Amino acid sequence: MTDIKRIEKAQEPCCCAPEKPQAPSHESGCLLCGKPLVYWPEAKSRVCAICGKTFEANCACEDGHFVCDDCHRAGADAFFLPLLLSSTEKDPLKLFEQVVSLPRVHMHGPEHHCIVPCVLLTAYRNNGGQLPGASSGLHAASPSVPSAAPRAPFSPVDPALENSVKEALRRSKQVPGGTCGYWGVCGAAAGAGIYMSILLGSNPVHKDAWPIPQQLVADCLQKIAEVGGPRCCKRTGRLCITIAAERTAEWLGIDMPLSEIRCRFLRQNRECLGPDCPYFPLR
């Protein structure tokens, strides 16, 4: 049984009491009505149409619906965490495609900021890399010395992976939606930096590790800028995963296979670059 089928099977009806109905969710545009989003140069106070809380927001749909980041990504990790923690997939791009095909992962949105580092940590582990807390309890990755020989086969439940992924989630959920356009820093690139920071045990005063995640983020942003806009969370996620995998092999000695991806989401993306996208299926 494949990883995705296991997740789908876990969602089959049972005798438990039914869950509270979820708000309508469209694949792209406004989650409530599907209409295009309107972006503003300055933030405005808006009430989330789902949770009712008030936020400073930079966009709403044409009908005025605003959905906060927490509600936008709500429930996505409940689907992709079990998949990642049980996966043996070594190709981070294949793993990314599995995750973004799951329920509650929308065409665009801040959930992608979380998916990128979690996918990379899982693929790193599956290719023999040691995560913080594995075996000796020390960071096996080093900014100057490649990882030691691949560790022994892992058990179905890997505490080191679970802890690393949960820490990646905690950090990446602090990256708001829209940072690509408003900060000049795509959340997928920040996610790649989170991945490398966790591997190296980086912190603000770590002399050796401190520059490495920043260099990775810079490389990711350079590639994202070369391809151009407007934003596409699927495209930038794939680009950042590719760059991160290449730098992981170069800096840490752990090779990750990378598939040639042809996008399946172009019909859901109103702003698709078409033939100008490196993942356009008809190139």
PLM region descriptions:
Residues E27, S45, N58, H65, ...:
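Residues immediately within or flanking Cys/His clusters that coordinate Zn2+
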Residues K5-C14, K20, Q130-P159:
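Intrinsically disordered, low-complexity terminal tails and inter-domain linkers enriched
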Residues K35-Y39, E56, F66, A76:
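Short functional micro-motifs and their immediate structural scaffolds
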Residues E89-L120, C263:
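Polybasic, low-complexity association/targeting segments
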